[in-house]
Amino acid sequence: ASAAFYLHAMVGRQSLYLWDNATYYNLQVRLESNFADGVFTGVGSTIYKTWFNDYAPLVINLLAEPFFMFTPRTANTFALLCALLIPSLVYYSAWLLLTVLRRKFQPKAPVLFTALSMAFVLLLPLLHIALYRGMPDLLGVAFAFMLLALGVGYDFSQPTPARLVSLAAFTGMLMLTRRSYMFTVVAFFLLYGVWALARAVRARQVQTVLRFGRFAAASLVCVGVPLLPMFWRIAKADYSDRYATYQTGGFLAELANQRVYLGWLVFVIMLIGILYGLYNAKARALSLIHI
């Protein structure tokens, strides 16, 4: 249904795409041009932009290139490609997360739980607004869902190398998709780490604490060190002038903006779900994860 909507919306009109669409479209064209000059030029340019540019082609553009190369290479076809490719990854990762949650919490009506949750994801206005305008950085939502799916119920009490490697890999891809997703990474691992360490200390599981520490150290070496120039540039940059136009008025004003984008219905549904989940002891953990 979503694919049909995007296909009708973008093929049946002529649009002028601005902001992120133009940025990523230019990155896509330059990516091809750089690799046309040689493999080393393409790889070097991609690494340089990843380290020192706010928008990097390493995840989104490399993912889109195997499909983009067979199109007329216009901004409209790039937007259409993103609107058809990215939702499939977001919906698939959401389905995987819901599958994990079903196994973990065993709801009384698992089919209804999955159907309503997927419907909520499919109908989320911000998802459609971003892709309707040809903004591909929504891809990070798929990686965020995968992080949640990998973290649910895992407390480092057992060695699972594949899970830990996947956690580190999806963390890196999420940060590279868009710089602002770093806030998601920090919040996720802060809460996740506190939860895992608290459980380990409470149960006096020394090996669990050591396993968590080794994972944190290995992740910093494998993900943090290669991206250190990017972190250093972000730490030195002053984004106040750039984002002052979009984010004004503080936290309450930002909530008001989200209400306008999401609409009253979605806002009320989310509020009711959160309050009921916090009230119901059996659903409290699930509600905290969604928050």
Name what the model sees in each region.
Residues 104-108, 145-164, 174:
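Membrane-interface transmembrane helices that cradle and orient dolichyl/undecaprenyl
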Residues 182, 192-194, 198-199, 211-249, ...:
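Membrane-lumen/periplasm interface segments of specific transmembrane helices
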